[in-house]
């Protein structure tokens, strides 16, 4: 039996409709998800693995130093007045070395190496790195603070050691060129024969002090970042590859072979989250991301803020802060004794240095911190931590991880140089480590993910629309044709015109004479 043309068309339209639904809403998402699971894992064949090993572009590493304009007043107990100088822009190249895969537990181990190059063109107007900055002497104050906390009976000796090592300084401030304090280093003279400075310098040689590099002739070179520039970090990091489960990709499971830290208390020692260079795909607005920072010995848990856009791609913006350790039960285990004010994190146990981490300009911190220093202006847009993720692939498109480092001006009666200082926490510098994917990598993401996704989106709606309207049209045509056929078939109850029949006229004969009607007399 030969089908009518409209039924053939209806079959085609129905097929297009069903294929549009099945392919567009069922098959393609499953194919895309399966492909992403393969591509986002840290297997040796993927592009993600290559970028994870060596980021093919430089990150933006910006340093803002605080210049103290009234050191003489501060030395006498006055309120510090500071002026921000920066940014000093450095191109930061990140790579992972000594990489080993472990098939049995789907992990990979590595060490990291960061290299910095000063970029004067991208630095603040007129900044060359040769500007002289006046700031609290980090090394001097750190030495005094550590002894006051751990061996207070030795504070008399520390006063003599300071005078010997730093040549009888007039105050606790250092006047130093910006690039020297950041990377090149400033000299610490340990070629002393007096007992106090010699004892301190001997202790320095035995311990690995952050920022301190040994030089010939009993000299040390101290800088904020120089010791990590171009050197391999000694710590061995173990993370999940995500081949067996892509949602585990990049998760830190051990450092130096230890499944957790021994720095803090309770769950604060756990490694929670990724290593910060790769994140799982398929993010939703309800997901809480986590990443572990080795520099601060803790995990951060950014939360979703809003939708945003970057170079035509819809992203999810996540934000974070340092936290309130005293009032947040999850963070209380970071406190060794009384918790610091809101927005401050004591790094003594992590860095072995009496430093405090905070948001730049004390953003989201205890208001009292701002009252103790003049010259700070916190701004959430300039000083907040924010990361824009492409949610399907979990790719960070734009990121600004900002943190400020602070130190307490130690007031101590047993050291003449310290006995008049204001007992307050003051800022030293803050950094902004960020990235913004350039056009090349954004286009790569568009061609590999978004253009196929958009094409399928257009095709599926065309198929569904064509199929839907085709089915409706064929249905209407089919039933209209049936009605007309039924109306014209024999034996139907249809009403037809009947032509009246002509009647033949016939002669009628009358028998007898016609009579008139009888008259009635009234």
UniProtKB/Swiss-Prot annotation:
UniProt keywords, alphabetically: Cell membrane, Disulfide bond, Glycoprotein, Membrane, Olfaction, Receptor, Sensory transduction, Transmembrane, Transmembrane helix
Record topological domains on the Extracellular side: 33-455
Function: Plays an olfactory role that is not restricted to pheromone sensitivity.
Organism encoding this protein: Plutella xylostella
UniProt record similarity statement: Belongs to the CD36 family.
PANTHER family: SCAVENGER RECEPTOR CLASS B TYPE-1 SR-B1 (PTHR11923), SENSORY NEURON MEMBRANE PROTEIN 1 (PTHR11923:SF69)
UniProt lineage: Eukaryota, Metazoa, Ecdysozoa, Arthropoda, Hexapoda
GO cellular component: cytoplasm; plasma membrane
Name under which the protein is recorded: Sensory neuron membrane protein 1
């Amino acid at each position: 039996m030969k089908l009518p043309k409209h039924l053939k068309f209806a079959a085609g339209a129905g097929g297009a409709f069903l294929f549009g639904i099945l392919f567009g809403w069922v098959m393609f998402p499953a194919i895309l998800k399966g492909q992403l699971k393969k591509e986002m894992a840290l297997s040796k064949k993927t592009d993600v693995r290559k970028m994870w090993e060596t980021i093919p572009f430089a990150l933006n590493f910006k340093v803002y130093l605080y210049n103290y304009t009234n050191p003489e007043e501060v030395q006498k107990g006055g309120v510090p007045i500071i002026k921000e100088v920066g940014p000093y822009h450095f191109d930061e190249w990140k790579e992972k070395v000594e990489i080993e895969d472990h098939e049995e537990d789907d992990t990979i181990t590595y060490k990291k190496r960061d290299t910095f190059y000063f970029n004067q063109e991208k630095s603040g107007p007129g900044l060359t790195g040769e500007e002289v900055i006046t700031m609290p002497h980090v090394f001097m104050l750190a030495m005094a603070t550590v002894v006051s906390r751990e061996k207070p009976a030795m504070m008399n000796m520390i006063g003599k050691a300071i005078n010997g090592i730093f040549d009888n300084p007039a105050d606790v401030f250092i006047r130093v060129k910006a690039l020297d304090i950041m990377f090149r280093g400033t000299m610490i003279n340990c070629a002393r024969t007096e007992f106090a400075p010699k004892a301190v310098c001997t202790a320095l040689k035995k311990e690995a002090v952050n920022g301190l590099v040994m030089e010939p002739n009993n000299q040390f070179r101290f800088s904020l970042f120089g010791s990590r520039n171009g050197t391999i970090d000694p710590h061995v990091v173990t993370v999940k590859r995500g081949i067996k489960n892509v949602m585990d990709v990049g998760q830190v499971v051990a450092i130096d072979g230890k499944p957790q830290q021994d720095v803090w208390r309770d769950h604060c020692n756990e490694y929670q989250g990724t290593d910060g260079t790769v994140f799982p795909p398929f993010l939703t607005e309800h997901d809480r991301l986590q990443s572990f920072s080795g520099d601060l010995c803790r995990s951060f848990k950014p939360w979703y803020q809003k939708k945003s856009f970057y170079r035509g791609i819809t992203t999810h913006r996540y934000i974070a802060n340092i936290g309130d350790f005293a009032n947040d039960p999850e963070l209380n285990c970071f406190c060794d004794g009384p918790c610091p004010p809101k927005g401050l994190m004591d790094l003594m146990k992590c860095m072995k240095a009496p430093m405090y981490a905070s948001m730049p300009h004390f953003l989201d911190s205890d208001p009292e911190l701002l009252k103790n220093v003049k010259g700070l202006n916190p701004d959430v847009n300039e000083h907040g931590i924010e990361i824009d993720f492409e949610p399907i692939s979990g790719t960070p498109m734009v990121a600004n991880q900002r943190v400020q480092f602070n130190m307490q001006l130690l007031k101590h009666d047993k050291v003449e140089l310290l006995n008049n200082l204001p007992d307050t926490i003051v800022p030293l510098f803050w950094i902004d480590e960020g990235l913004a994917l350039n056009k090349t990598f954004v286009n790569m993401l568009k061609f590999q993910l978004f253009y196929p996704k958009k094409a399928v989106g257009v095709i599926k709606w065309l198929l569904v629309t064509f199929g839907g309207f085709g089915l409706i049209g064929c249905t209407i045509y089919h039933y209209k044709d049936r009605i007309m056929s039924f109306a014209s078939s024999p034996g139907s109850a249809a009403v037809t015109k009947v032509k009246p029949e002509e009647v033949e006229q016939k002669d009628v004969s009358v028998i007898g004479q016609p009579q008139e009607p009888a008259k009635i007399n009234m």
